[in-house]
Each structure stands twice: as structure tokens, then as C-alpha cells.
Amino acid sequence: MTKEVVVESFELDHTIVKAPYVRLISEEVGPVGDIITNFDIRLIQPNENAIDTAGLHTIEHLLAKLIRQRINGLIDCSPFGCRTGFHMIMWGKQDATEIAKVIKSSLEAIAGGVTWEDVPGTTIESCGNYKDHSLHSAQEWAKLILSQGISDNAFERHIV
């Protein structure tokens, strides 16, 4: 018998969200009491556009570094297959407003001055697709996203 599962992100009505936003998906408690929080970091309005893979890949690498410089507890920040944003998994209870501020600050760094030397993991030894990066694209997407404002609410615009 196959176990019935519900995947929250496929239950979300993508036609009513208002990107860019940070949305708390869930807080889960592990078997020994550890808490993890899962966030939807939606940078692009679903079904209207998608970040090109090279730009998204570079944003991913930069966020891995920049988020950790701004807040403790990051487990992972991985892109959605639809290329409209990221899942962000954190240790402990976290607040969507604080995470939105961290994402905003990280995107500001990407938009305003990081250089190729600042992008971690861009060698054949450190990346599984090291040729598929674009700092220019990452910076242009960051500027566009920031111009729209980062909300801490997926359904009503509340810019941080």
C-alpha cells in the first residue's frame, strides 16, 4: 500500500500569492525536540516569469554565503524547480519578517557590488555545473526583485 502524502507547496494556490515575499511554510519538531522552520522565498511571481538557470545558480551560491553572514541557523537554501524562488530551511523558530530582512540585505549585496571573486563554489572541484553561472544576470534579477520590495506576507504586500 502506498502512503498518502500531501506536499504543502503543491497545495498552495500560486495564482493568489504576491511575489516577492517570504512565507513561513512550516515549523517541525524532530524526534528529540529540535525545531526546523521551512520558508518559501518567492522572488518572482509564479507563472509570469522565471529566473534563468545561470542567474539562479549564481544567486543560490551567493545566498549560501550571504545568509550565513547575516543570521545563524541556516541549514539550506535551495532553488525551486520552477525557478521562481527558494526553499529555506532553518534551525529553530524563525520569523518571516526577520528572514525577509535577511533576504533583502543579501539581495542588496548581490545588486550592489559583489564581484565574481565573491561568488563561492565556482570551480570544477566545488560545483557540479560550474560553467552555468552569470553574475550579471544575478545582479539584474536582484535589482528587479528589490525594486518591487520584499514582503513578509505572501497574500498582502507588507514590504520590509
UniProtKB/Swiss-Prot annotation:
InterPro entries: LuxS_sf, Metalloenz_LuxS/M16, S-ribosylhomocysteinase. It catalyses: S-(5-deoxy-D-ribos-5-yl)-L-homocysteine = (S)-4,5-dihydroxypentane-2,3-dione + L-homocysteine. Its cofactor is Fe cation. It comes from the Bacteria. Keywords: Autoinducer synthesis, Iron, Lyase, Metal-binding, Quorum sensing. Fe cation binds at residues 57, 61, 127. Binds 1 Fe cation per subunit. GO terms for biological process: quorum sensing. Its EC number is 4.4.1.21. It is an enzyme of class 4 (lyase). Pfam families: LuxS (PF02664). One of its GO terms (molecular function) is S-ribosylhomocysteine lyase activity. PANTHER family: S-RIBOSYLHOMOCYSTEINE LYASE. Belongs to the LuxS family. Homodimer. Involved in the synthesis of autoinducer 2 (AI-2) which is secreted by bacteria and is used to communicate both the cell density and the metabolic potential of the environment. The regulation of gene expression in response to changes in cell density is called quorum sensing. Catalyzes the transformation of S-ribosylhomocysteine (RHC) to homocysteine (HC) and 4,5-dihydroxy-2,3-pentadione (DPD). This is S-ribosylhomocysteine lyase. The lineage of its organism: Bacteria, Bacillati, Bacillota, Bacilli, Lactobacillales. The gene is luxS.
